[in-house]
């Protein structure tokens, strides 16, 4: 069995040191578990904060933020998908997820392709799109990486599956306007839609789907809806963080992926 841990929390806006301490706090709480993969949310070190994105991006190595996460990976003997940080490269900013192995080594990174420029979102005004899909061979499985709004583009996930992904990981900061967040009926609908999208991606591709979201109010206009989940290839929700600042954990059996793909050879159908 393979142990997966999601860390869902509310980053303190612009305070990298505080947020990194939160990550380590949650890891310490779970050090007695079998940690094969730990996943952090999108923008885990800064929160959603244009000022931080522009004024204090990390360099192409991930800077001190990813250096710290690399130390955590080695200390706790786990692979980590380090949510996302804002990376500056060749005078452009990217929303980048670094993948780190148990030795504390960066083994790859994925730059978000589909930026959120809708319903008041302005990500594309600040950040540039990536142009490469990424799968990574870890010591227990091949994983594919996508970020947040990528989920609205099913073909991306189909391609990751064709590339051999058995697990797809989605760091995210999935948000709604505060008027939606504060209305129980509207929030329930938004969360149900979010859950349905993620379960569909798992089932369409017969993979384990691991998504890690922020939670709670981000600013006076927006809130993150939580519901970080670990989902099986048959859409079973193995763990759900709801709307709390917490961790969720599940043991997964990768033989399930092989079994269902042997029955339904979906990558051979186009």
Task: Show the residue positions of the predicted features.
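N-terminal active-site segment of His-dependent metallophosphoesterases
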Residues: 1-37, 169
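Short beta->alpha transition motifs characteristic of CBS
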Residues: 46, 98, 110-116, 229, ...
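Residue-level recognition of beta-strand->loop/alpha-helix junctions
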Residues: 8-10, 41, 111, 213
């Amino acid at each position: 069995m393979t142990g997966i841990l999601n860390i869902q929390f509310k980053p303190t806006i612009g305070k990298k040191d505080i947020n990194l301490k939160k990550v380590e706090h949650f890891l310490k709480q779970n050090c007695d578990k079998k940690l094969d993969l730990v996943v952090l949310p999108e923008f885990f070190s800064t929160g959603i904060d244009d000022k931080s994105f522009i004024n204090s991006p990390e360099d192409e190595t991930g800077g001190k933020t990813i250096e710290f996460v690399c130390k955590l990976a080695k200390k706790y003997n786990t692979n980590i998908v380090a949510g996302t940080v804002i990376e500056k490269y060749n005078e452009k900013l990217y929303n980048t997820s670094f993948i780190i192995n148990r030795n504390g080594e960066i083994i790859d990174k994925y730059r978000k392709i589909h930026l959120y420029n809708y319903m008041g979102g302005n990500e594309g005004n600040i950040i540039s799109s990536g142009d490469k899909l990424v799968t990574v061979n870890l010591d227990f499985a091949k994983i594919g990486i996508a970020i947040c709004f990528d989920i609205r583009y099913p073909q991306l996930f189909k391609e990751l599956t064709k590339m051999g992904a058995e697990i797809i990981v989605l760091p995210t900061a999935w948000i709604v306007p505060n008027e939606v967040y504060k209305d129980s009926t509207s929030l329930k609908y938004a969360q149900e839609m979010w859950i349905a999208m993620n379960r569909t991606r798992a089932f369409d591709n017969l993979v384990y789907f691991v998504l890690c979201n922020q939670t709670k109010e981000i600013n006076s206009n927006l809130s993150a809806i939580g519901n970080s989940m670990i989902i099986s290839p048959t859409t079973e929700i193995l763990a759900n963080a709801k709307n709390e600042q917490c961790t969720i954990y599940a043991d997964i059996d990768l033989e399930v992926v092989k079994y269902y793909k042997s029955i339904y050879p979906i990558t051979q159908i186009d």
